[in-house]
Amino acid sequence: MSQTTDIQTDVQEHGANQQTSNRRLYMQLQVFGHCTDIGRLIASLQQHQVQAVLYQDVNDPRGVGLLTMHEEPTFFVTTLRNLVNSDPFRELSQKLEFTMIGRSYSSGYESDLEDWLLHRPRRTVLNPAWPWAIWYPLRRTGAFAKLSPQEQGSVLREHGTIGRAYGDADFAHDIRLACHGLDSHDNDFLIGLIGKELFPLSHVVQTMRKTRQTSEFIQSLGPFFVGHACWQTPSR
């Protein structure tokens, strides 16, 4: 006799005060080489009217990074696909090892759930006062999932406290996206560190290395993309 188990499935995002939402923002970074005319790329982005940031790659003098964002994931296989398969983007060489994608998510404590999921990530990456960015994926070890909820909360609060301190000082502003099942290397999260100067972004990574989460429960970090925005979609 077979026994069935009732599994509660809830794919909504949850915030404070019983807020719920089925909306979320997808963000993708694609990195290219052999760019000799950034102006043509900017003109193409303006023509296609996509929400995007174009970065100059710090570690490749002919490299660029294209960060795009949309609520509807079909955007990436329609509008964006057509864009990168047309001139001038199709003339570039793509660095697939740096392709990163993730979706906004909630922790259950957000006071303004819609702002957290949809608007804050856009505001952060499109702010002209914060042109510097470090993007990287990470994967936790299985041991983290086996911790009790109380232990997990303690580990995550340590990271959160550091992140808020850097943000309050206007040193670094973070974007945290989930990429379970979306990342080609089976990473769990995609992190963006955004700010007005590069050094504080590097410094927060250094500081995080000392935390329990990074020192004990991270299986892999990177690759790291370091870029400086040369064009951002104007904020609305």
Language model region names:
Residues 52-59, 94-101, 215-229:
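A generic structural motif
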Residues 28-30, 56-84, 133-139, 178, ...:
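Short, well-ordered beta-strand segments in beta-rich or mixed alpha/beta enzyme
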Residues 56-58, 81-84, 162-166, 204-206, ...:
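Short, surface-exposed, polar/charged, turn-prone segments marking secondary-structure boundaries
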Residues 193-236:
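Alpha-helical oligomerization segments
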Residues 154-186:
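Intrinsically disordered, low-complexity segments enriched in Gly and acidic/Ser/Thr residues
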Residues 49-52, 83-92, 208-217:
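A common structural junction motif
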Residues 1-49, 61, 70-79, 91-165, ...:
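Short S/T/G/P-rich N-terminal loop/turn motif that feeds into the first structured element of a domain
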